[in-house]
């Protein structure tokens, strides 16, 4: 089976799924093989559930009469099909990557652009070599543009995702100390993320630049076309303000106050507003979109629980984002406790970076410091240290945190959000 022959079948499908538990009528099921399980064994069952077609990489399960098709690699075929579909699309596609803030920025951009256009965008964090093709394949004729989030933890990954998504516009939120192990250090992070810049330059596509970020400015000096924000002489200039721990932006005499905490979210708001204005959206509509957006994804999420204010930032953590969160949280009025968990994938830099964060937390003078995870426990000798979130939960059952404000921040693998119900 090749993509051109399969494409007419795809056009009749409702959607593509790789999860056999979520098959609906007229879906196409891609049966991926794992180390311990071959989803091809579910092919006939998928057809019985109403699937329009199934793609397998195990030839013994092929049954063309039932629309069960064999390919050598389901992953390769998924990517090839998405590239073929991308070739048929004539809409602006915005590619987005960065060490921190890319998911929040993606959702803000989607909220703003949706004020005027029908916009498809990356659902959740489907931002890898499987998620990006799935997002491209979810773009329907009614969509007028798309926002594609691209994640990476090693070199050449963004390059691959760019060949699939072929963005017309691109933005890198920032360069931080994330996935140091896979990228081979901070310089490797810059090189890996900049693969988006390389693609945009070679394809003569548009780059969005935060001119307050010296790395972005240096990497895009000779790029055209470009959209800029951050400086008074940029294409778009906004000023930051805050109110009740929430960050907002001001454009001329108009203000938009978001439901996001942290000055680090200001540039995310600016990126969304800049793209909105570039695409002809009135600032009043941009204001409405930014003020209406409510984070629900454990990223800079502020929630009230009884008489306490909780800042939930448990989806991801690295030294850059952890430092920014601590500096923001210390500005909250009232007593403050931080519950911080390990920052994963730091490789040889891990012990030093955990020491640096713990030292920063102590210098900022929080009322209480609680750490979770083996890395922090190795360096935390002066305050409460737990090896796991489950261990923390057992402690919290008999020892409630008394502070008015509580920050929870950790890498996803720590599952720190499980402790919320016990705070």
Segments predicted by a language model, with ranges:
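Acidic, Mg2+-coordinating active-site environments of NTP-dependent enzymes
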Residues: 56-65, 171-309, 334, 358-362, ...
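Glycine-rich phosphate/pyrophosphate-binding beta-alpha loops
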Residues: 298, 314-324
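N-terminal leader/targeting and accessory segments in enzymes
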Residues: 1-80, 84, 330-334, 352, ...
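Mobile, glycine- and charge-enriched loop segments
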Residues: 20-31, 119-120, 130, 134-145, ...
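ATP-dependent carboxylate/acyl-activation modules
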Residues: 96, 297-299, 413-418
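Phosphate-binding loop of NTP-binding sites
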Residues: 76-207, 211, 215-223, 394-395, ...
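Residue-level signal for inorganic ion chemistry
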Residues: 27, 46, 81, 96, ...
């Amino acid at each position: 089976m090749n993509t051109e022959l399969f494409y007419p079948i795809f056009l009749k499908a409702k959607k593509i799924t790789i999860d056999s538990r979520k098959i609906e009528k007229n879906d196409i099921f891609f049966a991926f093989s794992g180390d311990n399980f071959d989803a091809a064994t579910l092919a006939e069952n998928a057809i019985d559930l109403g699937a329009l077609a199934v793609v397998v990489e195990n030839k013994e399960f092929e049954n063309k009469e039932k629309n069960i098709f064999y390919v050598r690699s389901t992953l390769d075929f998924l990517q090839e099909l998405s590239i073929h579909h991308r070739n048929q699309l004539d809409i602006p596609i915005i590619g987005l990557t960065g060490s921190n803030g890319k998911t929040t920025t993606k959702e803000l951009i989607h909220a703003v652009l949706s004020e005027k256009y029908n916009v498809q965008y990356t659902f959740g964090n489907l931002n890898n070599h499987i998620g990006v093709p799935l997002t491209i394949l979810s773009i329907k004729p009614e969509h007028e543009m798309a926002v594609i989030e691209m994640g990476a933890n090693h070199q050449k990954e963004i390059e691959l995702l760019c060949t699939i998504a072929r963005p017309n516009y691109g933005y890198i939120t920032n360069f931080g100390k994330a996935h140091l192990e896979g990228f081979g250090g901070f310089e490797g992070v810059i090189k890996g993320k900049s693969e988006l810049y390389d693609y945009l330059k070679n394809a003569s596509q548009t780059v969005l630049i935060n001119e307050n970020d010296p790395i972005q400015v240096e990497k895009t000096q000779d790029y055209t076309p470009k959209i800029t924000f951050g400086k008074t002489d940029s294409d778009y200039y906004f000023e930051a303000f805050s109110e009740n721990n929430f960050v907002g932006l001001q454009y001329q005499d108009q203000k938009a106050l978001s439901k996001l905490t942290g000055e680090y979210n200001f540039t995310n708001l600016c990126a969304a507003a800049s793209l909105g204005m570039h695409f002809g959206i009135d600032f009043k509509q941009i204001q409405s979109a930014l003020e209406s957006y409510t984070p629900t994804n454990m990223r800079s999420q502020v929630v009230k629980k009884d008489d306490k204010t909780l800042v939930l930032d448990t989806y991801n953590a690295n030294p850059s984002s952890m430092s920014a969160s601590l500096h923001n949280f210390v500005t909250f009025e009232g007593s403050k406790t931080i519950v911080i968990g390990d920052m994963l994938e730091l490789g040889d830099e891990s012990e030093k970076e955990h020491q640096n964060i713990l030292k920063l937390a102590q210098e900022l003078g929080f009322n209480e410091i609680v750490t979770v995870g083996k890395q922090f426990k190795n360096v935390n000798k002066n305050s409460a240290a737990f090896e796991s979130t489950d261990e923390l939960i057992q402690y919290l059952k008999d020892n409630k945190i008394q502070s008015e404000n509580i920050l929870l921040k950790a890498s996803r693998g720590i599952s720190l959000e499980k402790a919320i119900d016990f705070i």
